Amino acid sequence: MTEIEQAYRITESITRTAARNFYYGIRLLPREKRAALSAVYALGRRIDDVADGELAPETKITELDAIRKSLDNIDDSSDPVLVALADAARRFPVPIAMFAELIDGARMEIDWTGCRDFDELIVYCRRGAGTIGKLCLSIFGPVSTATSRYAEQLGIALQQTNILRDVREDFLNGRIYLPRDELDRLGVRLRLDDTGALDDPDGRLAALLRFSADRAADWYSLGLRLIPHLDRRSAACCAAMSGIYRRQLALIRASPAVVYDRRISLSGLKKAQVAAAALASSVTCGPAHGPLPADLGSHPSH
């Protein structure tokens, strides 16, 4: 096994283990694109893990600076994740410099004190999942002004879904991502009741979450304009990944209280069903690039 093959084996293992939602879409891609996207995901995950980890803030900043510097000499690296990413960038137009935006988003996470309004939240989302969307597009293709905008918008929609899904978990970790002006306008103050669930005696939090979920749905409408521009297998991947998050968003829109005491998730079977439906609906979108995956019926346990 070559160094590059071993590197991809590692990044694909990281993706299979950690990408509990994205993996269902990624596995619909042909082998070369699947491997490249696993390399992008693995480095994105490393950056995110630094920001979300237990290290002291100054240590996190040092770690992120080290990652940023490592990208300057990526072709000479022996780090398996960077070896795989460098190879992916030789096969596809992956903009390595764009990972700096992802690191900037992680720096925002370290210094997070909340956001003043939705515009400020969008800056955060754009540097995070919006950047991931554009990195994925570099592998899906084709890259244009329009498709880059759609990919960014779709990433922003996914991150808004995460914020609503994880509102309690984030609050327990001392973080609030809901815009302050919207919290103030509706008179919402996040707190826990005696059972440890988010307290909402007057339904104001539910009203804010439903409003936010409706807005996120609008961002999906913008971002999903990307799909007709993609080849069949890339379209299926994109539709599967976004479809899983849209299912979660639909649960929140229907009953915001569902996130008051837990972090909602779809079962592995439901995620596999979403992926299968995405693949089936992509049949009329154009020619596939490569044979269909033989393992469609299998899915990770998470």
UniProtKB/Swiss-Prot annotation:
E.C. no: 2.5.1.-
Record-linked CDD domains: Trans_IPPS_HH
GO terms classed as biological process: carotenoid biosynthetic process
Keyword field: Carotenoid biosynthesis, Magnesium, Manganese, Metal-binding, Transferase
GO MF, one annotated term: metal ion binding
Top enzyme category: transferase
Residue spans crossing the bilayer: none
Pathway: Carotenoid biosynthesis; phytoene biosynthesis
InterPro entries membership: Isoprenoid_synthase_dom_sf (IPR008949), SQ_synth_HpnD-like (IPR017828), Squ/phyt_synthse (IPR002060), Squalene/phytoene_synthase_CS (IPR019845), Trans_IPPS_bact-type (IPR044843), Trans_IPPS_HH (IPR033904)
Manganese as UniProt keyword: yes
UniProt remark on cofactor binding: ATP is required for the transferase activity but it does not seem to be hydrolyzed during the reaction.
Family: Belongs to the phytoene/squalene synthase family.
Name of this chain's protein: Phytoene synthase
Organism annotation: Mycobacterium bovis (strain ATCC BAA-935 / AF2122/97)
Organism classification: Bacteria, Bacillati, Actinomycetota, Actinomycetes, Mycobacteriales
